[in-house]
């Protein structure tokens, strides 16, 4: 089974839509971060979370636990969010949570254990929430304003620009893999 969480009016072939807004006519009316996802444990192969996670406030950790619960081992979570240093993020008052590669890494038990060993710090969410997501790929989408400027820059130069200026990247795309013990 494949699900599209918080998809609004956007539909994808083969995906069930979950949304809190009845006007979007979702397959399942669900308040993400508050309601349990209406699926059995280990029943979902893929989750699309396009421009929704940044809208989830206090229920964010509950939502991550619910996604983990319903997903099968090796399920893919496909995430797209506004980049945390873009006006796209800041321009919408309903964007209340930064979603970054660094903060999503905190949902990895492997990373949590490494962090404990390296720094004697239990910083992370994978172990205390009993979830395990590994980032398998990510990409920062260059804002249109910067595309032509980046054409002749080296990777090092691009990274330097992105460290020093806002609005270089418009979106962050990443894929997580659900890791469950056999």
Question: Model-found features: residue ranges?
Answer:
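S-adenosyl-L-methionine-dependent methyltransferase catalytic module, highlighting the catalytic core
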Residues: 57-62, 66, 72, 76-182
């Amino acid at each position: 089974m494949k699900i599209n969480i918080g998809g609004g009016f956007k539909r994808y072939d083969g995906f069930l839509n979950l949304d809190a807004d009845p006007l979007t006519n979702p397959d399942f009316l669900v308040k993400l971060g508050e309601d349990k996802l209406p699926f059995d444990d280990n029943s979902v192969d893929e989750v699309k979370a396009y421009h929704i996670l940044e809208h989830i406030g206090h229920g964010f950790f509950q939502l991550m636990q619910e996604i983990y619960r319903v997903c099968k081992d090796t399920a893919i979570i496909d995430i797209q969010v506004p980049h945390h240093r873009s006006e796209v993020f800041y321009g919408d008052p309903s964007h209340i949570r930064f979603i970054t590669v660094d903060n999503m890494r905190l949902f990895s038990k492997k990373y949590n254990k490494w962090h404990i060993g390296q720094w004697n710090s239990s910083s992370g969410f994978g172990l205390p929430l009993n979830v395990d997501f590994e980032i398998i790929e990510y990409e920062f989408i260059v804002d249109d304003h910067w595309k032509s400027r980046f054409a002749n820059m080296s990777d090092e130069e691009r990274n330097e620009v992105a460290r020093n200026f806002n609005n270089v990247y418009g979106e962050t795309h990443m894929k997580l893999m659900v890791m469950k013990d056999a």
